[in-house]
């Protein structure tokens, strides 16, 4: 019997003072940025990049209220989910390092009782879910924990996404025959894909499963948030918005793989990509992340309880 669940998310700045700390924690993570540099050089280089980038994104955070809602949304989700699972739900915010000691202490108190880790990412990548698993394993190597590695093709996720999209269309009086949906997932460098990361295959499979159940709607899969040099998964959301040609009047961008809204949905999609589509003459809107769905908590509980749990060794890239 599971004694507790670990609900893991990206984390995000709770206020402006968190921005540089958050970015430093993110960019110095070698599962994310990789590289062949010695550890101390890698850390110094990406700490410098994080400091510069923090200045660039500060106005973007100010534009969405000065913080990311992902931290609070994850905390509230854990509270609600606990009653559905009838067990404690502990939160882990990967790139908010000041929250880690409390999480580690909570996990330590569970001793050898079984725990299930639940990264809130539908599609697995070593750069995100793998990083979460590695961190927890490094901190608590003897922890009795198994993981929900991905759920992007789970019937409950597909059903919840469809319900969420169709309710949004209905609430905005948009016909399924007159809209085009851009499913925007987070991008990934091709160097990860070429080394066997299954992320893009899972995204494509999940996208097809949803599209097949929406036969009257034009759909496209794209990838956003490219950072740094090198080739990434394509097409990019930015390029697709710029080149899109459709006879549909309404174009909606659906956060795909983002279960919570944050800077990449509230600013990148809302303020940048939607503006491009509007300039092209479309009536464009951003669909909120699935967190806003009334069905989400119940669906997630079902996913957690019905998905085979995976041991850590298969989730960490050597």
From Swiss-Prot:
NCBIfam families: hemH
Family: Belongs to the ferrochelatase family.
Sites where the protein binds Fe cation: 186, 264
Cysteine disulfide links: none
Top-level taxon: Bacteria
Described purpose of this protein according to its UniProt entry: Catalyzes the ferrous insertion into protoporphyrin IX.
Subcellular location: Cytoplasm
Coiled coil stretches, renumbered: none
Stored SUPFAM superfamilies: Chelatase
Reactions catalysed: heme b + 2 H(+) = protoporphyrin IX + Fe(2+)
A single MF term (Gene Ontology): ferrochelatase activity
Record keywords, A-Z: Cytoplasm, Heme biosynthesis, Iron, Lyase, Metal-binding, Porphyrin biosynthesis
Record's GO cellular component terms: cytoplasm
A Pfam family per the record: Ferrochelatase
CDD domains (UniProt xref): Ferrochelatase_C (cd00419), Ferrochelatase_N (cd03411)
Main subcellular location: cytoplasm
Keyword Transmembrane helix among UniProt keywords: no
Protein name per the record: Ferrochelatase
Pathway in which this enzyme or protein is active: Porphyrin-containing compound metabolism; protoheme biosynthesis; protoheme from protoporphyrin-IX: step 1/1
Enzyme Commission identifier(s): 4.98.1.1
Keyword Cytoplasm in annotation: yes
């Amino acid at each position: 019997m599971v004694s507790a669940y670990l609900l893991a998310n990206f984390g995000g700045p709770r206020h402006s003072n968190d921005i540089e700390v958050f970015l430093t924690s993110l960019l110095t993570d070698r599962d994310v940025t990789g590289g062949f540099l010695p550890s101390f050089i890698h850390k110094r280089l990406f700490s410098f990049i994080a400091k510069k980038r923090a200045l660039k994104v500060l106005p973007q955070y100010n534009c969405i209220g000065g913080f990311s809602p992902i931290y609070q949304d994850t905390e509230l989700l854990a509270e609600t989910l606990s009653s559905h699972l009838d067990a404690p739900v502990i939160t882990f915010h990967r790139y908010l390092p000041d929250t880690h000691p409390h999480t580690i202490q909570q996990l330590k108190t569970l001793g050898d009782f079984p725990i299930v880790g639940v990264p809130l990412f539908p599609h697995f990548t070593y750069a995100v879910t793998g990083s979460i698993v590695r961190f927890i394993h490094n901190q608590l190597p003897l922890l009795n924990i198994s993981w929900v590695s991905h759920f992007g093709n789970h019937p409950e996720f597909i059903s919840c996404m469809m319900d969420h999209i169709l309710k949004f269309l209905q609430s905005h009086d948009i016909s399924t025959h007159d809209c085009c949906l851009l499913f925007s997932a987070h991008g990934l460098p091709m160097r990860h894909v070429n080394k066997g990361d299954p992320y893009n295959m899972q995204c494509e499979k999940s996208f097809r499963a949803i599209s097949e159940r929406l036969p009257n709607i034009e759909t496209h899969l794209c990838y956003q948030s490219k950072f740094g040099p090198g080739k990434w998964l394509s097409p990019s959301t930015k390029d697709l918005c710029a080149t899109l040609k459709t006879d549909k009047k309404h174009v909606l961008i659906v956060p795909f793989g983002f279960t919570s809204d944050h800077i990449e949905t509230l600013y990148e999609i809302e303020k940048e990509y939607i503006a491009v589509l509007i300039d092209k003459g479309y009536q464009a809107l951003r669909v909120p992340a699935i967190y806003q769905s009334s069905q989400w908590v119940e669906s997630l509980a079902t996913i957690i309880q019905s998905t085979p749990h995976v041991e850590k060794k298969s989730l960490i890239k050597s």
